[in-house]
C-alpha cells in the first residue's frame, strides 16, 4: 500500500513571530540584544602595560609592614613609583627632615595616590604656616601636565649661577635650615656703610633632557616673600622689595615686584613666602631680587608633552587623630581629564590607623584588571554598549551609553523555526522545500546564539539553493559598519573638542555633551534595530538551507523506496518499506547525525581607538553568531493513504 509522508507544521501559540530582512522566525523565547551594565566604583585602567602610578607608603612594597600597610595588591604595587614618607610636593620643595624621593616614570595613564605626607599634620613652616593653597596649585599643575605627557620626572638639580655676594642662608622657622627648592641666599651687610647690600642677579637653566627623560615643559616654583608694608621690609631704608624671574628675551615670567605692585596693607611685621607654579620651556632664565635676600629655583618637574592620556587622582587623607587637607580632591576636580577616587567613610587602617584601609582597597582593586571604559562614575569591563545611567565625565575608552532597558531590541532565542523570506535581495535557488510564507514543518531546530549580533545577509545565494556565503555576509557587515563609522566620525571629533574643554564648573558644556550622548544612544538603538532584523533573516535562511540539505538527505537515503512528489513530501510503499525501513529513512538521529549548516561566524566591530583621547563615546559592538541545527528525537510526520 502506498502512503504519503510529509513534514508537519509544528508552530503553536506559545511561539512569537520575529520579522527580519530575508526571512522570519518563530521562537519559543527571546532576549535583549544587550543587557544594561552598571559601573564598578573606583579606579581601573584601559591597558595594564601602559599605565604607571606615583605613591607613598600605601603603595610601597619596600615598607616593612607590606602588604598589610598597603591599599593595593602586590601586582598593582609593582606599577607604582613609591617611597614611604614621600610625596611629589615634598620632593619638589625638599623641606628639612622630610623624605626626598626621585619621582619619575612613563605611562599613558597615570595614577596618583600621594599627597598626605604634606598636609597640616606635617606642620611644615618655612615662612608659611599654611601650605594648602600652594599644594592645591601644585597638584593641579601636575595633573594637567601629566595628562598631556607620556613621561615625567623630577629634576632635582638645576644648573645655576649665584652672585658672589650671596651665600646659602637658613631660617629659624625652617628647623634652622631651609628648603632645597627654592634655596635661600643672603648677603651679609654691615651697617651703616653697607646697610642695604647689592641687587642680586642670578641665572638658572631648565634642561631639554634629564637623564633619559625628555623635557619639553617644566613646572617651576616661583617663590618670593610677601611683606605687609614697605616699612616692614624697608627698616634700613633700602627701597622696595622685588624678586622677579625673566626669560631670555627679558619678559617677566614670575615673581613679585613691590616697586610697581602694592603691599598687602596688613598689620603683620613678619614676611610670608608665596610660591606660584609656573610652566616654562627649557632655556636660560634670570632672577633679579632686591638686596639681602634671594630665593633661587633649584628644582623642577619636567614633562615630555608627547601623549595625552587619562589621569586618576586618589584621595589621600590620614586616619583618625591626624589633620588632613583636601587639596588633591580640589585639584583633580578642577582639572579637565582628571578622575577622582574618593572614600565615603573615614580612613581606617589595618596595619595602623593610617595604613591598610579596606574601603580604599576595594576602590583600587580595579587597578588589577583592564577595563573597556573608565570614568568618574567608575569602570566597566562588560561588552554591552548600554548602561542604565549616564556615566559622568571625564571618561575614556569604549564607554557605554545611557539607555532604558525597554528600548533595547530583542532577538529570538530558544527553539527557532524559520519561515520563508520575501526580501527582494534573496534570489530563488534551484530547488526550494518551502514556498513563500510557508512555515517550516516537521523538524525542530535549535539555534544556539552565543552573542548578540549576527551577520548581514547581503550578497548572492549559493547556486546549490540555500543560504548565503560567510564571505558575502562578512562583506555586508563591513560595508554597514563602515557606513555607521562615517556617520559617527564628525560627532566624535566634536565630542573630543568638548572633552578637552569640559570641567566640573562648566555646566553648559556638560549639558550639551549629555544631549549629544543621548542622541548617540538613540541612533545606536536604531542601528541595533536594523541589525536585529538582519540577524533574524540570517538565522531563518540558514535554517532553511539546513532543511533543504535534510530533505536531500532523506531522498538520498530512501533511494528507490520513496519518491519526492513535492517539497517536503514523499510517496512510499509500506509493503516494500516497513516501519523499521521508514525509521531508517526519516528518523535520522536514531541512526546517524543529521547534516547541519556550517556555523555562521560573522562580526561587526564598531569602535574607536581604545585610548581615544577624551572620548566619552568610544564604542565597540563586537559579537558573533554560531548557528547549529540539531534534530530533536521523534520526527513528526503526516501519513495519508
Curated annotation (Swiss-Prot):
SUPFAM superfamilies named among the record's database cross-references: Influenza hemagglutinin (stalk), SGNH hydrolase, Viral protein domain
Subcellular location, principal: virion
Residue intervals on the Cytoplasmic side: 638-641
Region feature Fusion domain-2, mapped onto this chain: 352-637
Compartments reported by the entry: Virion membrane; Host cell membrane
Glycosylation sites (chain numbering): 12, 47, 130, 381
Protein name according to UniProt: Hemagglutinin-esterase-fusion glycoprotein
Amino acid at each position: 500500500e502506498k502512503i504519503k509522508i510529509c513534514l508537519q507544521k509544528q508552530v503553536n501559540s506559545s511561539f512569537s513571530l520575529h520579522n527580519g530582512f530575508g526571512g522570519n522566525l518563530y521562537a519559543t523565547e527571546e532576549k535583549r540584544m544587550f543587557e544594561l551594565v552598571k559601573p564598578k566604583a573606583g579606579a581601573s585602567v584601559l591597558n595594564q602595560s601602559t599605565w604607571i602610578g606615583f605613591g607613598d607608603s600605601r603603595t610601597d612594597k619596600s615598607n616593612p609592614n607590606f602588604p598589610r600597610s598597603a591599599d593595593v595588591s602586590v601586582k598593582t604595587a609593582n606599577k607604582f613609583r613609591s617611597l614611604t614618607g614621600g610625596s611629589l610636593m615634598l620632593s619638589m620643595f625638599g623641606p628639612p627632615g622630610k623624605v626626598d624621593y626621585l619621582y619619575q616614570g612613563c605611562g599613558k595613564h597615570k595614577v596618583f595616590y600621594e599627597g598626605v605626607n604634606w598636609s597640616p599634620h606635617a606642620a611644615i613652616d618655612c615662612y608659611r604656616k599654611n601650605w594648602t593653597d600652594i599644594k592645591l596649585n601644585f597638584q593641579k599643575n601636575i595633573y594637567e601636565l601629566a595628562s598631556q605627557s607620556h613621561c615625567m620626572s623630577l629634576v632635582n638639580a638645576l644648573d645655576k649661577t649665584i652672585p658672589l655676594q650671596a651665600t646659602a642662608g637658613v631660617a629659624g622657622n625652617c628647623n634652622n635650615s631651609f628648603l632645597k627648592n627654592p634655596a635661600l641666599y643672603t648677603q651679609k651687610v654691615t651697617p651703616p656703610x653697607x646697610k642695604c647690600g647689592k641687587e642680586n642677579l642670578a641665572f638658572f637653566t631648565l634642561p631639554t633632557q634629564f637623564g633619559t627623560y625628555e623635557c619639553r615643559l617644566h613646572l617651576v616654583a616661583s617663590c618670593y616673600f610677601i611683606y605687609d608694608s614697605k616699612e616692614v621690609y624697608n627698616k634700613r631704608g633700602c627701597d622696595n622689595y622685588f624678586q622677579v624671574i625673566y626669560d631670555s628675551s627679558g619678559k617677566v615670567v614670575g615673581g613679585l615686584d613691590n616697586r610697581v605692585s602694592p603691599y598687602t596693607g596688613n598689620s603683620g611685621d613678619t614676611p610670608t613666602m608665596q610660591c606660584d607654579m609656573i610652566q616654562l620651556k627649557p632655556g636660560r632664565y634670570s632672577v633679579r631680587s632686591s638686596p639681602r635676600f634671594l630665593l633661587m629655583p633649584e628644582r623642577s618637574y619636567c614633562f615630555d608633552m608627547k601623549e595625552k592620556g587619562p589621569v586618576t587622582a586618589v584621595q589621600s587623607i590620614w586616619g583618625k587623630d591626624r589633620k588632613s587637607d583636601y587639596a588633591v580632591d580640589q585639584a583633580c576636580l578642577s582639572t579637565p581629564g582628571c578622575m577622582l577616587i574618593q572614600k565615603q567613610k573615614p580612613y581606617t587602617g589595618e596595619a595602623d590607623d593610617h595604613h591598610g584601609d579596606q574601603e580604599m582597597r576595594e576602590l583600587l582593586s580595579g587597578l588589577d584588571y583592564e577595563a573597556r571604559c573608565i570614568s568618574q562614575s567608575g569602570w566597566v569591563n562588560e561588552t554591552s554598549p548600554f548602561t542604565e545611567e549616564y556615566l559622568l565625565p571625564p571618561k575614556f575608552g569604549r564607554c557605554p551609553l545611557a539607555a532604558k532597558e525597554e528600548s533595547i531590541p530583542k532577538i529570538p532565542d530558544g527553539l527557532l523555526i524559520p519561515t520563508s523570506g520575501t526580501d527582494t535581495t534573496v534570489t530563488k535557488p534551484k530547488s526550494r522545500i518551502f514556498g513563500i510564507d510557508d512555515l517550516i514543518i516537521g523538524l525542530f531546530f535549535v539555534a544556539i546564539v552565543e552573542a548578540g549580533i549576527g551577520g548581514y545577509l547581503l550578497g548572492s545565494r549559493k547556486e546549490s539553493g540555500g543560504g548565503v556565503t560567510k564571505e558575502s555576509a562578512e562583506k555586508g557587515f563591513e560595508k554597514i559598519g563602515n557606513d555607521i563609522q562615517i556617520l559617527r566620525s564628525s560627532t566624535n571629533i566634536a565630542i573630543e573638542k568638548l572633552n578637552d574643554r569640559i570641567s566640573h564648573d562648566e555646566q553648559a558644556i556638560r549639558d550639551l555633551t549629555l544631549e549629544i550622548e543621548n542622541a548617540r544612544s538613540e541612533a545606536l538603538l536604531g542601528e541595533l534595530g536594523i541589525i536585529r532584523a538582519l540577524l533574524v533573516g540570517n538565522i531563518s535562511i540558514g535554517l532553511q538551507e539546513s532543511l533543504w540539505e535534510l530533505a536531500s538527505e532523506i531522498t538520498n537515503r530512501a533511494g528507490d523506496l520513496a519518491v519526492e512528489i513535492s517539497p517536503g513530501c514523499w510517496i512510499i510503499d509500506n509493503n516494500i518499506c516497513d516501519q523499521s525501513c521508514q525509521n531508517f529513512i526519516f528518523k535520522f538521529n536514531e541512526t546517524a547525525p543529521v547534516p547541519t549548516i556550517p556555523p555562521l561566524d560573522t562580526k561587526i566591530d564598531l569602535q574607536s581607538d581604545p585610548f581615544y583621547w577624551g572620548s566619552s563615546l568610544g564604542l565597540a559592538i563586537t559579537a558573533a553568531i554560531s548557528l547549529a541545527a540539531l534534530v530533536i528525537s521523534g520526527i513528526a510526520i503526516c501519513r495519508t493513504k
